[in-house]
């Protein structure tokens, strides 16, 4: 089609669901700590990969950045001391959407970088 601009969304074939459908993510983070920007960045990356996924944010305690997938804690900044890598979270979502068992994300990037 000439003159057609923008992106087109293609629905999955009948009987198939959109990747990430049925997966629910809850991110609990410390707003006074300035972690909202990290949450928004991570949520944007997840939505880009899985447009139909449900992501809920909650305000958490001091230093918190905790991620649950379908009610299971998969990442804790309080335990790891950093933030999750996007690729690790995307992989956990892929596993959840395929019905595979979830493992805790133990890799983390430092909360800040000193130049």
UniProtKB/Swiss-Prot annotation:
Keywords: Acetylation, Apoptosis, Cell membrane, Cytoplasm, Disulfide bond, Lipoprotein, Membrane, Prenylation, Redox-active center. A lipid is attached at residue 112 (S-geranylgeranyl cysteine). Residues 113-115 form a propeptide. Residues 1-22 are annotated as: Disordered. One of its GO terms (cellular component) is cytosol. Interacts with GPX1. SUPFAM superfamilies: Thioredoxin-like. It is found in: Cytoplasm, Cytosol; Cell membrane. NCBIfam families: CXXU_selWTH (TIGR02174). It holds the Pfam family Rdx. Belongs to the SelWTH family. Disulfide bonds join 30-33. It comes from Bos taurus. The keyword Iron does not apply. InterPro entries: Selenoprotein_Rdx-typ, SelW_related, Thioredoxin-like_sf. The modification N-acetylserine is found at residue 2. Isoprenylation facilitates association with the plasma membrane and enhances the migratory phenotype of cells by inducing increased filopodia formation. Residues 1-10 have a biased composition (Polar residues). It is a lipid-anchor. Increases cell migration by inducing filopodia formation at the leading edge of migrating cells. Plays a role in regulation of apoptosis, possibly through control of CASP3. May be involved in a redox-related process. This is Migration and invasion enhancer 1. GO terms for biological process: apoptotic process; negative regulation of apoptotic process; positive regulation of cell migration; positive regulation of filopodium assembly.
